[in-house]
């Protein structure tokens, strides 16, 4: 059985359109902040005025008002709410100082969103319509990258398709979130590492560009490049992947270090103080990591598959279990299986990336010296999911999960996702 054709992503597009239409503006995690950050970038504002300062930028007040109208808190949304939101002009009360969180992402994480912001500003588009145009463009950009991933690694394309059709993936793709292009870039880079291309100048440039953009967008996934150290990766592809990652990571980290600020006023959050706490008591921190894994692993898995709204809209447990079983089955029956060295490397990369993400959230989002970790969400692991699944592959599976099975489960799971959103917001 061959892998999945990129044409299966037409299903992903139509399923994502359902979330785009049903999901109210601003009800995807951090969507207002991503929207405002792209608007600030489109106006030439790329970083805070000073290190660790709250990144405020004067944006038209209508860009805040629409999210207040569509807040869906304490009441059910009605057509009247949408009518009011659609009528809001850019500047009903002039400019308003707006916090452009999450400012610690570099502007390269917002290329499609910034393009929409520039176009909408030139056309005089109202904020409400701009939100939906940006969602569509972000979705198409991410799906384009995922299609390239499926073409780059046809033997692992079913794993990529299964990741792309997850309710959580589609919900993120159909939003202004920087996660949308990052997921696309992450899956494309995983594809290059799982099924290395021939070292032609074109493919070397493609691998290097993908590694660089991913590093500058979401540096948490830099360890994926280490798969290039193992055969059958051609030496020049290895150099392209490692060198581009090595260039991008220091830039992204320097930007994040400068632009970070405490987005939790009232809580003592300080990365430098947190790091000193870790160094002073490493065994205590190891216990924090272990407790987080023990207590929250199931929760992260559920969020990976589908947790909507501001993490307050749930899929039925049975649907989460069905998707989980599908992912495991896709991984176990993937072919060809990784050889022993690449399998061990893949497992090490996934484990290290998991703990690296937990560490980053402990440093930048958790209270200093806390006994728990705040801020980790299961969706953060979507870009490396194909590598995790490929590491499960049996040496000689008697059968393989095909794209039709993946598609059927996706239709069922996302239908339940639509129902959950409608019941929560309308």
Language-model features: locations:
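Membrane-interface helix-loop-helix junctions at transmembrane boundaries of multi-pass membrane enzymes
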Residues: 2-3, 156, 200, 235-240, ...
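Transmembrane-helix signature of polytopic, membrane-embedded enzymes
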Residues: 3, 123-128, 149-167
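Interfacial juxtamembrane loops and adjacent helix segments
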Residues: 45-133
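Specific aromatic-rich, kink-prone transmembrane helix
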Residues: 147-148, 183-198, 210, 387-388
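Membrane-interface alpha helices of multi-pass inner-membrane proteins
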Residues: 170-171, 202-219, 223-230
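Short acidic/glycine- and proline-prone juxtamembrane loop motifs at membrane-interface regions
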Residues: 175-182
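Perimembrane helix-loop-helix junctions
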Residues: 192-202, 222-248
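Membrane-lumen/periplasm interface segments of multi-pass, membrane-embedded glycan/lipid transferases
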Residues: 254-337
